[in-house]
Swiss-Prot record:
The keyword Cell cycle belongs to this UniProt entry's keyword annotation: yes
Protein name: Mitogen-activated protein kinase 4
Active site, per annotation: 149
Gene for this chain: Mapk4
Gene3D superfamilies: Phosphorylase Kinase, domain 1 (3.30.200.20), Transferase(Phosphotransferase) domain 1 (1.10.510.10)
Top-rank EC class of the record's enzyme: transferase
Length: 583
């Protein structure tokens, strides 16, 4: 098996020396390919992301990703162990001297996209996952970071303990809320199905609220099993949003009338509100979605406010929802802007910034820092300058969790002194709940659900059961016809659509399921229409290619992968849509 893994590594161009063995394909990140491997030194399974540094632009994006992931340390964020160069060498702050970089990170069993492909989650599972997603977003946003690519494929799940972790920060961006970043933000990064209306209208001007819109779309998808707004292109995406999300503010109405008047109803009434679009979702969840999926980002809940909503009350615990103690500042964003300008000339110009580069690459989460050197969360008691700047819509400086931080003499000292098992109000209504908590490293994860974890006790047996014939889902029919200008486009797209598109790489093994049946009653897995990865075929063809490396054309890997996956007619449309989302 080790020889097969080494062959796979050579086929994909992985050169990490002999430390990592048993490579297996996992998928593709935004900036590179991802393989699983076994770290023989640490004796653990890891995921290794390869980033090719082919030019100044790719190097700039790699530096930004490494800078961000090295500083983020949270239970609901995929942990990064180290960043290596060719042959497993240490980068030592000299990224610009290498042609490739490897990010060694925590291995996660599956992702949310794979789980959703197997069927609708129970509401209990959806609520638990949404809580952890907001818990991770609260920390990310407090660090002045935008993820910018939240979608089920970038949300990873451990089916053993139901822990959710946010991953793939290849498109993440540092944004200091006290300064205007207008003109320096990239266009259209979020996958269009999870793209907010503000991002569709003004792709260069957005805030942390774009992540919250994506989170709301993901919650609706978990509750219903299908994408909330599955537009074939940006025009249809905006049309679907306007059919469901009300436009309240006058400035938004004026902009829509100026930009796309044919798509706007004269009465500004929505055709299918969320309560009608999602008839099987309970009223409390609908209220939660209505507060997240607002047309204007100023009216949208923040991650911290979402954690305090009644829908999250079974898990809400402000004392166990930490924020970043070392957020990124405007200086970090300026470094990126300077590097962007420097990359336009030549790579050697980057030698002018060795300090900022090496400090970001050599930072460790456990590094000791003096309290005076740590910048507090800028949202806690800070007052923005009264200048003409873009104001972040997080107008919640007096929220309960921030008052908790301000009243404590030190948030770090409070974290060490607090006994979470006794001081936290878990609001679960069960006197024995604390006795069932999942403990790790002498502290509980208060959001762990023993009952839901028990529901997974038979997923391995169910995964080995013979699959039943899959029943193709009928496409969702529309009740109303689109606007006149949109009709021709919709008719053209209709011929290529066979259902809701989903952009996710094909699995290479049977994926674990979240069983909805009680413990002791495993649920058989329904056979899906997703393509299956044949490892034996892949290995045999890979060995043939390895014997003739000089004859390997650039597109040979695509032919190899295609030969190992069974084709389905519907996959062609999905593949085309998925490739367009990776721009």
């Amino acid at each position: 098996m080790a020889e097969k893994g080494d062959c796979i590594a050579s086929v994909y161009g992985y050169d990490l020396g002999g430390r990592f063995i048993d490579f297996q394909p996992l998928g593709f990140g935004v900036n590179g390919l991802v393989l699983s491997a076994t770290d023989s030194r640490a004796c653990r399974k890891v995921a290794v992301k390869k980033i090719v540094l082919s030019d100044a632009r790719s190097m700039k994006h790699a530096l930004r990703e490494i800078k961000i992931i090295r500083r983020l340390d949270h239970d609901n964020i995929v942990k990064v162990y180290e960043v290596l160069g060719p042959k497993g060498s240490d980068l030592q702050g000299e990224l610009f001297k290498f042609s490739v970089a490897y990010i060694v990170q925590e291995y996660m069993e599956t992702d949310l996209a794979c789980l959703l492909e197997q069927g609708t989650l129970t509401e209990d599972h959806a609520k638990l996952f949404m809580y952890q997603l907001l818990r991770g977003l609260k920390y990310i946003h407090s660090a002045n970071v935008l993820h910018r690519d939240l979608k089920p494929a970038n949300i990873f799940i451990s089916t053993e303990d139901l822990v959710l972790k946010i991953g793939d920060f290849g498109l993440a961006r540092i944004v200091d809320q006290h300064y205007s970043h207008k003109g320096y933000l990239s266009e259209g990064l979020v996958t269009k199905w999870y793209r907010s209306p503000r991002l569709l209208l003004s792709p260069n001007n957005y805030t942390k609220a774009i992540d919250m819109w994506a989170a709301g779309c993901i919650l609706a998808e978990m509750l219903t099993g299908k994408m909330l707004f599955a537009g074939a292109h940006e025009l249809e995406q905006m049309q679907l949003i306007l059919d469901t999300i009300p436009v309240v503010r006058e400035e938004d109405k004026e902009e829509l009338l100026r930009v796309m008047p044919s798509f706007v109803s004269s009465t500004w009434e929505v055709k299918r509100p969320l309560r009608k679009l999602l008839p099987d979702v309970n009223s409390e969840a609908i209220d939660f979605l209505e507060k997240i999926l607002t047309f204007n980002p100023m009216d949208r809940l923040t991650a911290e406010m979402g954690l305090q909503h009644p829908y999250m009350s079974p898990y809400s615990c402000p004392e166990d929802e930490p924020t970043s103690q070392h957020p990124f500042r405007i200086e970090d964003e300026i470094d990126d802007i300077v590097l962007m300008a420097a990359s336009q000339s030549q790579l050697s110009n980057w030698d002018r910034y060795p300090v900022s580069l090496s400090s970001d690459l050599e930072w460790r989460p456990d590094r000791c820092q003096d309290a005076s050197e740590v910048q507090r969360d800028p949202r806690a008691g800070s007052t923005p300058l009264a200048e003409d700047v873009q104001v972040d819509p997080r107008k919640d400086s007096q929220s309960s969790s921030e008052r908790f931080l301000e009243q404590s003499h030190s948030s770090m000292e409070r974290a060490f002194e607090a006994d979470y098992g006794r001081s936290c109000d878990y609001k679960v209504g069960s006197p024995s709940y604390l006795d069932k908590l999942l403990w790790r490293d002498n502290k509980p994860h208060h959001y762990s659900e023993p009952k839901l974890i028990l529901d997974l006790s038979h997923w391995k047996q169910a995964a080995s059961a013979p699959p039943r014939a899959a029943v193709a889902a009928d496409p969702v029919s529309r009740e109303d016809e689109p606007a006149s200008l949109f009709l021709e486009i919709a008719q053209w797209v209709k011929s290529t659509q066979s259902g809701s598109e989903r952009a996710s790489p094909p699995p290479d093994a049977p994926e674990p399921r979240l069983s909805a049946s009680p413990p002791g009653h495993p649920t058989p897995i329904d056979g899906g229409a997703s393509p299956q990865f044949d490892l034996d075929v892949f290995i045999s063809r890979a060995l043939k290619l390895c014997t003739k490396p000089e004859d390997l054309p650039e597109n040979k890997l695509g032919d190899l992968n295609g030969a190992c996956i069974s084709e389905h007619p519907g996959d062609l449309v999905q593949t085309e849509a998925f490739s367009k989302e990776r721009w």
